[in-house]
């Protein structure tokens, strides 16, 4: 990880992505919250909002934009269609392409949801000496589809997706304590230990992102992940949906400290 990206402003990060830089965003703009994007047609927006309300761990909503709107208070002067490093375009639930600029696919009917991202609490983990392996190895965080169904809402339903960070056993409690103060970006882990408990067969083969090294004696710790709405879109098959490429987030102007609860 280039240490310079840790210190740049969210606006500068978004400018670089707008100019065509494609990279995972873990470790970027320390101190600022990152967000997942999922945009669906207005006709599906209520179902998606209800899905998020019923599944707050994987889908903590930071903001919802008006139909067709592509700017908002979390990205001053920004453009949601261009300021994320990479986007996934879904048609009838099928992933049809991944692009660095979603402008040509955006319609006046799309409603954009910005969902909290666990990258937002990683600076707090690192500040407390808790390792974050994908940052150490300069790769994307590993993410997995589980066999746990989310609560459905109208036409929207699908499996829970989780991110994984391996930790020494003596630091698991610290990670739980630290992340418990960030409920708006997934909060505490949903599972600790045996991945089979989530229906995950092989940690070395994530469904999204990259595999990371798990050292002898370390325990895999799983957090709910904001890719969950994209898994629901693939199952629910709306005519069009646009999401961030997993691990390639919107870096917002919202400070991590504003998300901390006592």
UniProtKB/Swiss-Prot annotation:
Q: Per its UniProt record, what SUPFAM superfamilies does this chain match? A: PSTPO5379-like (SSF160920)
| Gene Ontology molecular function: any one | lyase activity
Q: What is its EC number?
A: 4.2.1.-
Instruction: Tell me yes or no: is Protein transport among this UniProt entry's keywords.
Output: no
**Family matches, as Pfam families:** D-Glu_cyclase
**Superkingdom as given in the UniProt entry:** Bacteria
Q: Which InterPro entries match?
A: D-Glu_cyclase, Putative_hydro-lyase, UPF0317
Q: Carries keyword Lyase?
A: yes
Q: Which UniProt keywords apply?
A: Lyase
Query: HAMAP family from the entry?
Result: Hydro_lyase
Family in the record: Belongs to the D-glutamate cyclase family.
| Name used for this protein in its record | Putative hydro-lyase Mflv_5194
């Amino acid at each position: 990880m280039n240490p310079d990206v840790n210190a740049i402003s969210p606006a500068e990060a978004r400018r670089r992505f707008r100019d065509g830089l494609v990279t995972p965003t873990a470790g970027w703009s320390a101190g600022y919250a990152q967000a997942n994007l999922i945009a669906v047609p207005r006709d599906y927006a209520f179902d998606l909002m209800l899905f998020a309300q019923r599944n707050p761990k994987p889908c903590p909503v930071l903001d919802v934009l008006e139909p067709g709107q592509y700017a908002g208070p979390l990205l001053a002067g920004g453009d949601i269609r261009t300021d994320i490093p990479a986007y996934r375009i879904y048609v009838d639930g099928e992933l049809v392409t991944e692009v660095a600029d979603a402008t040509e696919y955006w319609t006046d009917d799309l409603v954009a949801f910005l969902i909290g991202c666990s990258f937002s609490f990683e600076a707090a983990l690192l500040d407390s000496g808790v390792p974050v392996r994908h940052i150490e190895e300069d790769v994307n965080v590993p993410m997995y589809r589980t066999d746990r169904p989310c609560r459905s809402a109208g036409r929207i339903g699908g499996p829970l997706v989780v991110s994984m960070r391996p930790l020494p056993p003596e630091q698991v409690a610290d990670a739980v304590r630290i992340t418990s103060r960030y409920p708006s970006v997934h909060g505490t882990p949903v599972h600790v230990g045996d991945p089979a408990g989530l229906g995950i067969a092989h940690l070395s083969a994530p469904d999204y992102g990259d595999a990371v090294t798990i050292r002898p004696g370390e325990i895999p710790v799983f957090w709910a992940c904001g890719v969950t709405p994209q898994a629901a879109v693939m199952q629910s098959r709306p005519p069009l949906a646009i999401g961030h490429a997993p691990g390639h987030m919107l870096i917002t102007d919202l400070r991590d400290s504003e998300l901390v609860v006592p």
